[in-house]
């Protein structure tokens, strides 16, 4: 059972919070259904606040309470003032013929009003200070805490053990790091201050009500318990749905990140639509949840407003009774009514704050759960033994092991192995038998389930984890380089290494020569996952990185598998030298590389069945003997033909020209060359680069995306206008009510009051429907827009050409971050926010119209302050927009570092570079933090000005109002009407200004999204243009093709390459690492177009053929195959996305690739998930799946780039036979370093310096005694050494 496949499994851990949002194994679904929605406690959300943050929050809260108390206190002043006016009303009934007796009361009234104006101004000054401190301090505290949460979360991820990553998968963690922490940031900042402000307004309103008129307050409060209950239900519903919505978006984010990370594979197999469907499926789930949330929340909201208006009706009726019976003055009744009114309306204004806080609690549950998860193997721990010296004696004693993700499948079943200090031990055996697992256990990436592993007689569990890993150097099968310079990549081996030591290590690894040919030499950027370099070049840098550690123990897992013949011979010599004095464990499928090992251990089914030297094991005729026999048969012809001494050949022909050592960049089929002109500062993403050439977008353009939902907007806007107009309508009723309490018959007064009370009840019933419809329609339209934006953005990304993905700014991490944050920020200014803005605008607009009708002079005075509020709003928007832009760039830069570290966590851990990545990440968080500090002050100042102007305008209003009344220009009731209409309007305007930060962010994000939507790629994967030939024979011609990668125009790759392969022929491309072989494959796939010359298929230029048709004719198997985190069956079926591939066909394909028996041993067989990038499978198993994936599309042309390099001997033989069979009747282009696999090719082409130097059959090229002859000679010599 070749079951090393389980080694990096991603089956999900049962019984943990992550189950709520994971891609999830079927076995956990039942458990997850039973689980409750998880939220953390409100105070726990602030667990990362230090004394300074707590001080900020305390002062911010105190000031929020002071700010919130301002309006109810103002109502006391208003009540007293109303009594003054009503008492004096009889004196100012006539507009003309003033008598001397009227002048004195007029002067007294004006003096009284001046006193009240000072009260208002005093309150305004207090609010100016309080509002600034409230907003700025809460924003400052949030910025500081978010920085700490990001740091702690990233630190927690880096310290987890490998078994945790196997269960979790890495892609969702990146989504959590961007999306979820943004939600926490939204929930713990200024919105908390605004919540306390609203709560203070609520309580202050009721306290004032009780003091001024407890009877009336109690009557109004009778309805409050029902109101409170509906608010509680509303909050609960919101948080439940928010949690589910988060989970759906996390899944969508994981799909997007996976597809963007494997973009070449997606495009080559035409999988864009399939990825888009997978993505949209999760988005649809999120949308449905969002719509349900909108319905539930807004029914609660409608009920709340119905209850509020019902309480007003009751208040008016009872209040009028109290005034008529002389228990209350009209001023008292007004104070009580207005205080309760303002207090009750503050509940509605708290709604977005409660929503944001609920989202934050849901997001924080998952984040804090990960932070609190204590790993059993903690690489940050200082505990454990750190010996002064290590000899390097290793002992594996009865080691049993199963991967945590697949506890029921045993990998090692009693491994026993002793390695003496300085010895080299080679582990051999079939793919998936447990060899790599052994190396992982030695590094303590996992702990054995039974048995012990010791170094120098000490159990490795007693060593300090970091110390243990530092004495071990690792070179793995698929080396991971980081997106920085070559020198920095080598420095990851050991932090304090000098440049001289780097050069020494590079020379030992045979990489010095190719590095010195690069324009930037050691400062050349290697691209994401080392994509600028060929496989061989990456491998040599990885070897240099291991050597620079000067490790006591060296672990080589297929360290030379990706090298060409010449490099392999030289690197092998370097490794032999490096092994001197070190304990070395080697895994190699190419057995010629391990025959000089001191001990060779034969693995079979998780145990060592034999060990000894090469000659001893050959005599035993066991596992090793069988493997050697199978492997040597392939290269026998070579060894028979070359008994000649290589030195003689060189002397005779002057061969092995320097030319074929050429190290011009080749791009491994994963990604192309990316620009390195810019050195280190490119890593920081040039400050202006991200937003250069991104034109600003009008918000109408965003709304146009919602035009199909126009009926929702029409209904929502009408309802918002009605809701906005309801409040000024109350102003008219109020002024009429005050007018009733002049002189007159009490029975008539009571009758009129009853009528107005019924009007209020009617408004309540109306508001139930209008508030529900407003919230629901805008909410639904917002959810649809969100889904559409995300879907369009992802679709637009998948449409782009390779040169766009080669750009450093468009790395997987940056794109995933952009996909999550841009959508969230645009949604932040649409949907329910848009509804509130429409409502508040209608409120102010209606208020102004009514005010002009009843008193234009006073209205003009009040409106004269509006420009000041507007200017402060505009300044706020501009400054916040600048901050949003800087913030976005800095967070994307941090996101890239995090994504790279998380995706390559095994390499980071092996190199003990967790601290380095953490410090890089923390450094990138400084700028967003500095921005948040600036933003706090800007936002605080502008917010406080807009809030305080309201009070100053009231001071002016009533002072001027007194003058107008005294001079007979207005009646008191009209002053009240104008005042209250403008009060409600100004409150609304104040709340509208609080959305400025969201709007600033949304504008920037919208600009980014539209620049992406509108970008026309040079090669459009979605294009329907071009020829669709009925028949394709399969002949391929390259005519004088010249090509440089777009991002490095000064580095020629192909320089006039011409070659032809006829229908059904097999063409083999050979040449040294980096000579342009894979570039040929990429041009054929039309990842790029040649700069000069043509690529022809059946005589037709590739550019003229429809791109989808063209790629459908090609099947590709690359050097490092990329599998997707879905089932084995789905991965095989991915080969042909134009149809539904049947299960029978999938099984037949698996049998043909010799992987069916292995799949049958798995618990879920073909439904087994292969893990992130296929990490549950061994290299050989992945490669076999990739071959079947390519063949299932029945291509006319088969492209094999090192298709068998990762296979063990036994698998290689079987797969090679399968490939030989697959080639029948097909045109085949093969790239191979192992020349024994291509000797039967119809045509072998030797590429050097981007041109064809030799071509012919195996025999013809041998006869020429040229470059190919030398390559074969070296390889045959290595095979027989």
Swiss-Prot record:
Q: How is it modified after translation?
A: Phosphorylated. Phosphorylation is required for PC efflux activity. Phosphorylation occurs on serine and threonine residues in a protein kinase A- or C-dependent manner. May be phosphorylated on Thr-44 and Ser-49.
Q: Which intervals hold domain ABC transporter?
A: 394-630, 1036-1274
* Sites where the protein binds ATP 1: 406, 432-437, 477, 1179-1181
Q: Does the keyword Metal-binding apply?
A: no
Q: Provide the residue span(s) of the region labelled Interaction with HAX1.
A: 625-649
Description of how the protein assembles with itself and partners: Interacts with HAX1. May interact with RACK1.
Know the name of this protein?
Answer: Phosphatidylcholine translocator ABCB4
Q: Which organism is it from?
A: Cricetulus griseus (Chinese hamster)
Tell me what gene encodes this. ABCB4
């Amino acid at each position: 059972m070749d079951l090393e496949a389980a080694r990096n499994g991603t089956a999900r851990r049962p019984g943990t919070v992550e189950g709520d949002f994971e891609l999830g194994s079927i076995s956990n679904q039942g458990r997850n259904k039973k689980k409750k929605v998880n939220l953390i406690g409100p105070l726990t959300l602030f667990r990362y606040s230090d004394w300074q943050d707590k001080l900020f929050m305390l002062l911010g809260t105190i000031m929020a309470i002071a700010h919130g108390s301002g309006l109810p206190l103002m109502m006391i002043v208003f009540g007293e003032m109303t009594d003054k006016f009503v008492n004096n009303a009889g004196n100012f009934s006539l507009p003309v013929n003033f008598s001397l007796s009227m002048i004195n009361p007029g002067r007294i009234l004006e003096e009284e009003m001046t006193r009240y104006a000072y009260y208002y101004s005093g309150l305004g000054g207090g609010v100016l200070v309080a509002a600034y401190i409230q907003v700025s301090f809460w924003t400052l505290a949030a910025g500081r805490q978010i920085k700490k949460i990001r740091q702690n979360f990233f630190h927690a991820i880096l310290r987890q053990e490998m078994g945790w990553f196997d269960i979790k998968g890495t892609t969702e963690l990146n989504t959590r790091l961007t999306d979820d922490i943004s939600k926490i940031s939204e929930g713990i900042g200024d919105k908390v201050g605004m919540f306390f402000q609203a709560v203070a307004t609520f309580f202050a309103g009721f306290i004032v009500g009780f003091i001024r008129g407890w009877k009336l307050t109690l009557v109004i409060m009778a309805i409050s318990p029902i109101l409170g209950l509906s608010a509680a239900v509303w909050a609960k519903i919101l948080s439940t749905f928010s949690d589910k919505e988060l989970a759906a978006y996390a899944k969508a984010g994981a799909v997007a990140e996976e597809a963007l990370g494997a973009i070449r594979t997606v495009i080559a197999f035409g999988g864009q639509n399939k990825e888009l469907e997978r993505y949209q499926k999760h988005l649809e789930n999120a949308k449905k949840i969002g719509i349900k949330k909108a319905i539930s929340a807004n029914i609660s909201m409608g009920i709340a407003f119905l209850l509020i208006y019902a309480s007003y009706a009751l208040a008016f009726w009872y209040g009028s009774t109290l005034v008529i019976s002389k228990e209350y003055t009209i001023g008292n009744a007004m104070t009580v009514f207005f205080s309760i009114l303002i207090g009750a309306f503050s509940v509605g204004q708290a709604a977005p704050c409660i929503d944001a806080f609920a989202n934050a609690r849901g997001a924080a549950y998952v984040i804090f759960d990960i932070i609190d998860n204590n790993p059993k193997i903690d690489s940050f721990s200082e505990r454990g033994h750190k010996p002064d010296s290590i000899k390097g004696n290793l002992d594996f004693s009865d080691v049993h092991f199963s991967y945590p993700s697949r506890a029921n499948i045993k990998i090692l079943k009693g491994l026993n192995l002793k390695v003496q200090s300085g010895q080299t031990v080679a582990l051999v055996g079939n793919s998936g038998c447990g060899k790599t697992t052994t190396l992982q256990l030695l590094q303590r990436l996992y702990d054995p389930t039974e048995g012990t592993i010791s170094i120098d007689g000490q159990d490795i569990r007693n060593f300090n984890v970091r110390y243990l890993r530092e004495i071990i150097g690792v070179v793995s099968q698929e080396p991971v380089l980081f997106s920085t310079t070559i020198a920095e990549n080598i420095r990851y081996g050991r932090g304090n290494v000098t440049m001289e030591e780097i050069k020494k290590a590079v020379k030992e690894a045979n990489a010095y020569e190719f590095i010195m040919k690069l324009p930037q030499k050691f400062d050349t950027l290697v691209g994401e996952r080392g994509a600028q370099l060929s496989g061989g070049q990456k491998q040599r840098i990885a070897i240099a990185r291991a050597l620079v550690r000067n490790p006591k123990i060296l672990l080589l897992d297929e360290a030379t598998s990706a090298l060409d013949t010449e490099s392999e011979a030289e690197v092998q010599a370097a490794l032999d030298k490096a092994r001197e004095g070190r304990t070395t464990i080697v895994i190699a499928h190419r057995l010629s590389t391990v025959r000089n090992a001191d001990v060779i251990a034969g693995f079979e089914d998780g145990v060592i069945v034999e060990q000894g030297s090469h000659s001893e094991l050959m005599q035993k005729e066991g596992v090793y003997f069988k493997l050697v026999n199978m492997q040597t048969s392939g290269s026998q012809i070579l060894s028979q033909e070359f008994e000649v001494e290589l030195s003689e050949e060189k002397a005779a022909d002057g061969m092995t020209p320097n030319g074929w050592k050429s190290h011009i960049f080749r791009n491994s089929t994963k990604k192309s060359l990316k620009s390195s002109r810019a050195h280190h500062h490119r890593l920081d993403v040039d400050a202006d680069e991200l937003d250069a050439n991104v034109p600003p977008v009008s918000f109408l353009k965003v709304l146009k995306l919602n035009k199909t939902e126009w009926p929702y907007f029409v209904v929502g806007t009408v309802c918002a206008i009605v809701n906005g107009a309801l409040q000024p309508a109350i102003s008219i009723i109020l002024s009429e009510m005050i007018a009733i309490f002049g002189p007159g018959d009490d029975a008539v007064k009571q009758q009129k009051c009853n009528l107005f009370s019924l009007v209020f009840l009617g408004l309540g019933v109306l508001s139930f429907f209008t508030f529900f419809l407003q919230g629901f329609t805008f909410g639904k339209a917002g959810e649809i827009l969100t889904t559409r934006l995300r879907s369009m953005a992802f679709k637009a990304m998948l449409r782009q050409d390779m040169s766009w993905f080669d750009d450093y700014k468009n790395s997987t991490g940056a794109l995933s971050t952009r996909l999550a944050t841009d959508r969230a920020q645009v949604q932040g200014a649409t949907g329910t926010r848009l509804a509130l803005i429409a409502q508040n605008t209608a409120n102010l607009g209606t208020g102004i119209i009514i005010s002009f009708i009843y008193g234009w002079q006073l209205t003009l005075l009040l409106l004269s302050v509006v420009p000041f509020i507007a200017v402060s709003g505009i300044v706020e928007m501009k400054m916040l927009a600048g901050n949003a832009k800087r913030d976005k760039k800095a967070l994307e830069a941090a996101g890239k570092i995090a994504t790279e570290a998380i995706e390559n966590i095994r390499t980071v851990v092996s190199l003990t570079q967790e601290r380095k990545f953490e410090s890089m990440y923390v450094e990138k968080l400084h700028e967003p933090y500095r921005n948040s500090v600036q933003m706090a002050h800007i936002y605080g100042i502008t917010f406080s000005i807009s809030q305080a102007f309201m009070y100053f305008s009231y001071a002016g209003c009533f002072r001027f109002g007194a003058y107008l009344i005294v001079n007979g220009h207005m009646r008191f009731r009209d002053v009240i009407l104008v005042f209250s209409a403008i009060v409600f309007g100004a409150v609304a305007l104040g709340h509208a200004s609080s959305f400025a930060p969201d709007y600033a962010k949304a504008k920037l994000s919208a600009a980014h999204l539209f620049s992406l939507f509108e970008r026309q790629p040079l090669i459009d994967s979605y294009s329907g243009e071009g020829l669709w030939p009925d028949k394709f024979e399969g002949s391929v011609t390259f005519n004088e093709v010249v090509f440089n990668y777009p991002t490095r125009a000064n580095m020629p790759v192909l320089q006039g390459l011409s070659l032809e392969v006829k229908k059904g022929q097999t063409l083999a491309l050979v040449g040294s690492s980096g000579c342009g072989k894979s570039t040929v494959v990429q041009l054929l796939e039309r990842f790029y177009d040649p700069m000069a010359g043509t690529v022809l298929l059946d005589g037709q230029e590739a550019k003229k053929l429809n791109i989808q048709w063209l790629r459908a004719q090609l099947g590709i198997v690359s050097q490092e195959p990329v599998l997707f985190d879905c089932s084995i069956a789905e991965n095989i079926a991915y080969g042909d996305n134009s149809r539904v591939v049947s299960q029978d066909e999938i099984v037949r394909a698996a049998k043909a690739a010799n992987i069916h028996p292995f799949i049958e041993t798995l618990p879920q067989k073909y439904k087994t998930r292969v893990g992130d990038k296929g990490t549950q499978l061994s290299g050989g198993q992945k490669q076999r799946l990739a071959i079947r994936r390519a063949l299932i599309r029945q291509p006319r042309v088969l492209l094999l780039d090192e298709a068998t390099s990762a296979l063990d001997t036994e698998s290689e033989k079987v797969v090679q036979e399968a490939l030989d069979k697959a080639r029948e009747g097909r045109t085949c282009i093969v790239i191979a370093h192992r020349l024994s696999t291509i000797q039967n090719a119809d045509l072998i082409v030797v590429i050097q310096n981007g041109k064809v130097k030799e071509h012919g059959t195996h025999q013809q090229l041998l006869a020429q005694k040229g470059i190919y002859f030398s390559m074969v000679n070296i390889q045959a010599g290595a095979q027989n050494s």
